[in-house]
């Protein structure tokens, strides 16, 4: 029995579950979405909260430019470019015989400085918020000070009295670990069995304590939570429920709007924006989607992408069970090459807060991620890790979803003028030998097609 029903009963009441359990690539577009003006109230956070996070990141920019020289050229602002993907677009259009396809772009968070993934947004913001709270309370700084003061030996000695803990499949651990250690904190990163060895090695090289767990993501998070509960000076970054992570991700939207302006890309009712966000536990894509809805309203359509073996958010929202269920409850193994998305139980906070704001969800097979990685690398010259490719098939899924397009009332002209944005969540820091192994796998899969 699964939550009081047999699997057969679930498949009858929720037919898509049969496809999920069979590990088939699946799409589901939520008929229950609402207008942004109404549904944004579900979140419990506001535009003012996002502005506060944005202002905090600017206060810390001089500090970041000082301690991370790779951010100096951008003045300590951690941001990524928007890059066209003409070859991937051509492949998707040909494969799907797509009409009125619009343009395809990459938001290259894979190239973000410091930790090379989307987690450099939320993770670094939350660590900086905690550091700021402690430093203000201790009188080390005032809000109007130059925060480069925090690069001093005195500040590092102060922060070294405190510990930060987090559970992660990899990328969040990298961003939390590197940032916390740079400030002077003691750091423990609890890593799930899915975490790549190079990510653990990089953390240890930065002076971070890595605690390895033989179980999956949810266990790693729980271990981090328990560590913090037993130590009053230990702060736990809760990837499943953190508003500060969420707000750090949300800041991306106002910056994206400026990049679109500079590139001459319009976003309005006649020029819709579709954004494809790889989803693990949900904090990163949820936060970005919240920011996008605040900035672009009903002109933006956010779609979450998950591995066929880890469809936790789709399952949670579709059944209405949210974090009360896991993919394992339904016999799905949560084992995927998309290590950053290997999450069996979704964030209840994100699922409930965002369910009326996310247009749809789809799953993608590992083999497809590898195949697309080769095209992205060889033809569009972008380096993305497997998880980051999950957003690429999104344009195909949306434009083949006739019922969804009809329900939304899109005209051929609107679709022709649409912008499709793949959120490239990570990849630049993958070691060359590991990346070449991925490419070899992708090429062998191409050869067998």
UniProtKB/Swiss-Prot annotation:
Enzyme Commission (EC) number: 4.3.1.18
One Pfam family matching this protein: PALP
Residues carrying N6-(pyridoxal phosphate)lysine: 119
Keyword Lyase recorded: yes
Catalytic activity: D-serine = pyruvate + NH4(+)
Essential cofactor(s): pyridoxal 5'-phosphate
SUPFAM superfamilies associated with the record: Tryptophan synthase beta subunit-like PLP-dependent enzymes (SSF53686)
Example GO molecular function: pyridoxal phosphate binding
Keywords, comma-separated and alphabetical: Lyase, Pyridoxal phosphate
Gene Ontology process terms (BP): D-serine catabolic process; isoleucine biosynthetic process
Superkingdom, taxonomy of origin: Bacteria
Lyase among keywords: yes
Signal peptide: none
Database matches in Gene3D superfamilies: 3.40.50.1100
Family: Belongs to the serine/threonine dehydratase family. DsdA subfamily.
Protein name per its UniProtKB record: Probable D-serine dehydratase
């Amino acid at each position: 029995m699964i939550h009081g029903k047999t699997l057969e009963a679930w498949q009858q009441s929720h037919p898509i579950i049969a496809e999920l359990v069979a590990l088939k690539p699946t799409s589901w577009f939520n008929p229950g979405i609402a207008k942004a003006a109404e549904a944004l109230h579900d979140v419990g956070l506001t535009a003012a909260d996002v502005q506060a996070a944005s202002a905090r990141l600017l206060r810390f920019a001089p500090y970041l430019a000082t301690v991370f020289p790779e951010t100096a050229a951008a003045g300590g602002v951690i941001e990524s470019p928007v890059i066209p993907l003409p070859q991937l677009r051509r492949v998707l259009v040909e494969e799907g015989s797509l009409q009125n396809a619009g343009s395809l772009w990459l938001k290259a968070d894979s190239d973000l400085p410091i930790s090379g993934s989307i987690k450099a947004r939320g993770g670094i913001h939350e660590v900086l918020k905690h550091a700021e709270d402690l430093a203000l309370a201790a009188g080390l700084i005032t809000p109007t000070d130059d925060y480069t003061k925090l690069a001093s030996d005195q500040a590092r000695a102060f922060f070294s009295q405190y510990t930060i803990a987090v559970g992660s499949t990899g990328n969040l651990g990298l961003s939390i670990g590197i940032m916390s250690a740079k400030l002077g904190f003691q750091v423990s990163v609890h890593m799930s069995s899915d975490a790549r060895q190079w990510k653990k090695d990089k953390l240890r090289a930065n002076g971070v304590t890595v605690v390895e767990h033989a179980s999956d993501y949810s266990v790693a998070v729980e271990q981090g939570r328990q560590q913090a509960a037993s130590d009053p000076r230990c702060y736990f970054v809760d990837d499943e429920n953190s508003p500060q992570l969420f707000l750090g991700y949300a800041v991306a939207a106002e910056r994206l709007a400026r990049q679109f302006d500079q590139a001459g890309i319009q976003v309005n009712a006649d020029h819709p924006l579709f954004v494809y966000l790889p989803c693990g536990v949900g904090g990163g894509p949820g936060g970005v989607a919240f920011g996008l809805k605040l900035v672009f309203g009903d002109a933006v359509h956010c779609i979450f992408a998950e591995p066929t073996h880890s469809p936790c958010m789709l399952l949670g929202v579709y059944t209405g069970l949210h974090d009360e269920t896991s993919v394992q409850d339904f016999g799905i193994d949560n084992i995927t090459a998309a290590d950053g998305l290997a999450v069996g139980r979704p964030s209840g906070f994100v699922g409930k807060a965002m369910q009326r704001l996310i247009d749809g969800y789809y799953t993608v097979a590992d083999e497809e991620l590898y195949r697309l990685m080769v095209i992205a690398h060889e033809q569009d010259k972008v380096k993305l890790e497997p998880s980051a490719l999950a957003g690429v098939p999104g344009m195909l899924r949306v434009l083949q979803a006739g019922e969804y397009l009809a329900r939304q009332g899109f005209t051929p002209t609107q679709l022709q003028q649409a912008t499709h944005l793949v959120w490239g969540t990570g990849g630049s820091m993958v070691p060359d030998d590991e990346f070449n192994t991925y490419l070899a796998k992708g090429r062998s899969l191409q050869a067998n097609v």
